[in-house]
């Protein structure tokens, strides 16, 4: 049984991957209390002792405001931590999966969807951190994959962490009768975290390289929120009361474009459900709709 170490293993993605694949692999799902990735000696010592076959590096600080307010801390985790893990992987001969982000393109003036070969122009600190790691990994490792995730969504599961995501947040807001603000000028892929986990395991059989990873979606965030409310059976008048079109941050002149082109991944046999289909399937799987 091959051993997988997952940093960020207590998080939204990591906890589900560990739960899904613990019968096929020996999985060490590590949280920040288990391993401080900013401590180079600790990272090297742990990985040398465990001798994993794979390391999935999912630890990171994605919160935009935190990254702005604490840029040194964010860089220590998002950049230094990733490079320490990569060096340890090289030392022990482990294959590394580095989880990157769609936010590499939030500063691009070109229209998406973006391909892996397109020039990344990150605006946010998190995207800049991820790009720096992507650029430095080839100097450290040969055997690695970079996966650029879309935005993940999912529902609560026993023993797993729930993260901020469009599906669960929309359902909660509807239940609590709270207004939901969303822009018609924000475009990004949105993927079921469990479908991500299924396909992430398949990635381990693919050639090394960089892959855009997740569901294709051409609808705005506003349209997706409306779709979710319709799917869970809210009446039209209730949807109109709850859903507020908010274009204060993004507009026709300032569109947020984060869509990724997944043609390369599809050519290797990994195909995600489109976002709306993935949302429908998730709601059906959890018994929320029939």
Label each region the model flagged.
Residues 3-20:
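N-terminal Rossmann NAD(P)H-binding glycine-rich loop of SDR-like oxidoreductase domains
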Residues 26-45:
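Adenosine-cofactor binding site in Rossmann-like domains, unifying the SAM/SAH pocket
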Residues 40-77:
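NAD(P)H-binding glycine-rich loop region in Rossmannoid oxidoreductase-like domains
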Residues 69-97:
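NAD(P)-cofactor binding segment of oxidoreductase domains
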Residues 76, 80-84, 104-147, 153, ...:
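Catalytic helix-loop patch of NAD(P)-dependent Rossmann-fold dehydrogenases
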Residues 136-188, 195:
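NAD(P)-dependent short-chain dehydrogenase/reductase
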Residues 197-250, 290:
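Mid/C-terminal beta-alpha module of Rossmann-like enzyme folds, strongest
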Residues 220-226, 243-281, 286-290:
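Conserved C-terminal active-site "lid" loop/helix of NAD(P)H-dependent oxidoreductases
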């Amino acid at each position: 049984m091959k051993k997988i170490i997952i940093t960020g293993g207590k998080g939204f993605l990591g906890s589900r991957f560990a739960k899904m694949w613990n019968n096929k692999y020996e999985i060490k799902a590590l949280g920040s209390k288990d391993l401080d990735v900013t401590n180079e000696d600790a990272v090297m010592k742990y990985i040398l002792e465990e001798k994993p076959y794979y390391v999935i590096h999912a630890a990171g600080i994605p919160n935009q405001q935190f990254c702005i307010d604490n840029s040194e801390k964010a860089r220590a985790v998002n950049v230094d931590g990733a490079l320490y893990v990569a060096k340890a992987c090289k030392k022990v001969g482990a294959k590394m999966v580095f989880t990157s982000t769609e936010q590499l393109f939030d500063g691009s003036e070109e229209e998406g969807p973006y391909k892996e070969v397109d020039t990344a122009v990150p605006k946010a600190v998190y995207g800049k951190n991820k790009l720096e790691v992507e650029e430095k990994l080839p100097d450290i490792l040969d055997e690695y994959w970079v996966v650029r995730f879309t935005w993940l969504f999912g529902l609560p599961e026993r023993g797993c962490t729930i993260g901020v995501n469009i599906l669960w947040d929309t359902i909660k807001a509807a239940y609590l009768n709270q207004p939901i603000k969303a822009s018609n000028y924000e475009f990004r892929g949105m993927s079921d975290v469990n479908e991500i986990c299924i396909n992430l395991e398949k990635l381990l059989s693919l050639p090394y390289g960089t892959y855009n990873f997740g569901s294709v979606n051409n609808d705005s965030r506003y349209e997706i929120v409306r779709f979710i409310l319709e799917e869970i059976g809210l009446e039209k008048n209730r949807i109109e009361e709850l859903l507020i079109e908010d274009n204060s941050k993004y507009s026709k002149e300032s569109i947020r474009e984060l869509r990724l082109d997944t043609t390369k991944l599809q050519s290797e046999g990994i195909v995600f459900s489109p976002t709306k289909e993935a949302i429908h399937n998730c709601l059906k799987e959890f018994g929320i709709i029939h």
